[in-house]
Amino acid sequence: MPLHVPLLLAILLVAGPALAQAPSPDSWIADSKTGCKIRNPAPQPRESVTWSGACPNGIAEGTGVLQWFDDDRPTDRYEGEVRDGWENGRGIATSNVIADRYEGDWRDGWRHGQGIYSFDNGDRYEGEWFEGMRTGRGTMVWADSSRYEGQWLDSKPNGQGIYTDTGDAVYAGTWSSGCFREDGRKMAVGTTLKECGFE
């Protein structure tokens, strides 16, 4: 999914990989000044875009800046590599709607590969991504100084990992969809104790 859907920088952290799909024939938007086309699988009313880079065959390509607008007001911005109209390669995404920032690898409009996501509330994730989700190895440090380091799946701790809470209590071992239970100790990260079946 491209980054320009309002609040998408945050939304994709909880959205599932099932959102990935081949673009439909009308999934493009054109820079009104140059006519250069950019992929747009989730069109929004009143949105527009500008592209500062090359445009072979009428499609955005190479390195440049994609600036998205909502009713002529700047919203999301991507600076980096584009291939076949998609964010592809290395790039930085920021938003005027929320103060989140992502810097890292992209594939077909998704955060995919290695990257750093800084949230407007002070939280920070650094690690692997798969189709917009924290998946693989990574470290999340929350603004309150709690942290999780280890394996992730679909933006939740999953596999081997270590969570340290604000009181320096450590939960090290095997996690499943954000749930931890070992030796009578229970913890939930990115979910709730109730959703884990612990209450």
Q: Would you name each region that the model predicts?
A:
Residues 1-5:
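Positively charged n-region of N-terminal signal peptides that target proteins for export
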Residues 18-199:
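Intrinsically disordered, low-complexity repeat tracts enriched in Gly/Pro/Ser/Thr and acidic residues
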Residues 6-15:
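Bacterial N-terminal signal peptides
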